[in-house]
């Protein structure tokens, strides 16, 4: 089974898969921001949270120690995080789509040409740019009441207070940077140029097919 990718293209497909999985996994994991509330550790992503306060029987706040997403899109603490959720999700979807096509190119001949590889690299650049934009928007939501309660009531936009950034935030940003800088460059050398003989064969095959169809139509 021949591949439609060069040796560089095979490495590009592998790296594309790694960056897409890293960014997408980080997007879904609620470990972008770490803080504490009522003596319990709390962590956030853009649309998920681990450990949250609820009213107990005595109207006292108690911490529920579990992870989950917000009940609705409108329940996400800030407009910045809502935008971050949409933008980052779109970027991850684009990177996953390109990575899937790149992996298929390792197994299928004539799937990815030199020009197609460059177009896929451009799509990776856009996907990485979207995820990077989401990472840049994320600090704009640190002034929401929910985040401030977790960060010692001293957090603000681009000010963490007592909180700290989590590994998932760095992983998402790193995956986006690798997709934009490395994968986009490697994609320029990923696809194979079609062989002239194969081009001639395809042209002749198509010409014969059209001739047979025309002959069939002209017969009474």
Curated annotation (Swiss-Prot):
Main location group: membrane
Residues passing through the membrane, by range: 86-106, 122-142, 165-185
Keyword Cytoplasm: no
Glycosylation (residues): 153
Membrane topology: Multi-pass membrane protein
Subcellular location: Membrane
Keywords: Glycoprotein, Membrane, Signal, Transmembrane, Transmembrane helix
GO cellular component annotations of the record: membrane
Signal sequence annotation: 1-23
PANTHER family assigned to the protein according to its UniProt record, in alphabetical order: LHFPL TETRASPAN SUBFAMILY MEMBER 1 PROTEIN, LIPOMA HMGIC FUSION PARTNER-LIKE PROTEIN
Similarity section: Belongs to the LHFP family.
Protein name: LHFPL tetraspan subfamily member 1 protein
Gene name tied to this protein: Lhfpl1
């Amino acid at each position: 089974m021949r591949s439609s990718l060069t040796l560089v293209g095979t490495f590009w497909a592998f790296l594309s898969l790694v960056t897409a999985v890293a960014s997408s996994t980080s997007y879904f994991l609620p470990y972008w921001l770490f803080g504490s509330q009522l003596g319990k550790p709390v962590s956030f992503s853009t649309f998920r949270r681990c450990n949250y306060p609820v009213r107990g029987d005595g109207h006292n706040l108690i911490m529920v120690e579990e992870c989950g997403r917000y009940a609705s899109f409108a329940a996400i603490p800030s407009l910045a995080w809502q935008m971050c959720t949409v933008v980052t999700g779109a970027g991850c979807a684009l990177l996953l789509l390109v990575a899937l096509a790149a992996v298929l190119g390792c197994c299928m001949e004539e799937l990815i040409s030199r020009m197609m590889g460059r177009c896929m690299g451009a799509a990776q650049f856009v996907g990485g740019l979207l995820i990077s934009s989401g990472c840049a928007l994320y600090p704009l939501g640190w002034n929401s009441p929910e985040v401030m309660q977790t960060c010692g009531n001293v957090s603000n936009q681009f000010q963490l207070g007592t909180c700290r950034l989590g590994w998932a935030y760095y992983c998402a940003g790193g995956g986006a940077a690798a997709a934009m800088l490395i994968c986009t460059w490697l994609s320029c050398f990923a696809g194979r140029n079609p062989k002239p003989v194969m081009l001639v064969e395809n042209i002749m095959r198509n010409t014969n097919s059209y001739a047979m169809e025309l002959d069939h139509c002209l017969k009474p």
